């Protein structure tokens, strides 16, 4: 191409393609797997009280940890590659204030990864809470990994 030619613009292609909401997916969760709990006891009797996250407390997603303490893999969480250097946090769900909800569902496959991790989010007064806000409200308590 000579210097007088201008290349045709191309559709922007970011390094990651986030899942769009669809009939099958809502906010990166499989719609068929989404459950909502207004009771901590109802949630913990089904899934336990241990959660963790890869990322920073200003984010709002944590993942369920199995009763033996085994966390989901990076691929099951469908995290972007830059999260490989993000910190790891472990928590116990300690309480659920009145009018708060736990919303949980299975992560949909994305970024060429399998998905399948059970993601957990906390809603209070209709607002999605960050992990830092959950800690301030006493919903989440840090736990030791030993």
What are these model-derived regions, one by one?
Residues 1-80:
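ADP-ribose/NAD+-binding catalytic cleft of ART/PARP-like enzymes
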Residues 87-146:
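Active-site and NAD+-binding cores of ADP-ribose-processing enzymes
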Residues 74-93:
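Acidic, aromatic-enriched beta-alpha/helix-loop junctions
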């Amino acid at each position: 191409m000579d210097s007088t030619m201008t290349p045709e613009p191309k559709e922007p292609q970011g390094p990651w393609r986030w899942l769009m909401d669809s009939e099958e997916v809502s906010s990166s969760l499989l719609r068929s797997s989404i459950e909502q709990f207004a009771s901590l006891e109802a949630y913990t009797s089904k899934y336990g009280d241990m959660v963790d996250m890869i990322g920073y407390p200003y984010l709002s997603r944590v993942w369920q940890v199995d009763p033996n303490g085994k966390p989901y893999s990076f691929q099951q969480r469908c995290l972007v590659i830059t999260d490989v250097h993000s910190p790891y946090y472990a928590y116990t769900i300690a309480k659920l204030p009145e009018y708060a909800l736990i919303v949980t569902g299975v992560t949909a496959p994305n970024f060429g990864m399998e998905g399948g991790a059970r993601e957990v989010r906390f809603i209070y007064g209709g607002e999605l809470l960050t992990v830092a806000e959950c800690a301030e409200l006493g919903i989440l308590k840090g736990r030791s990994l030993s």
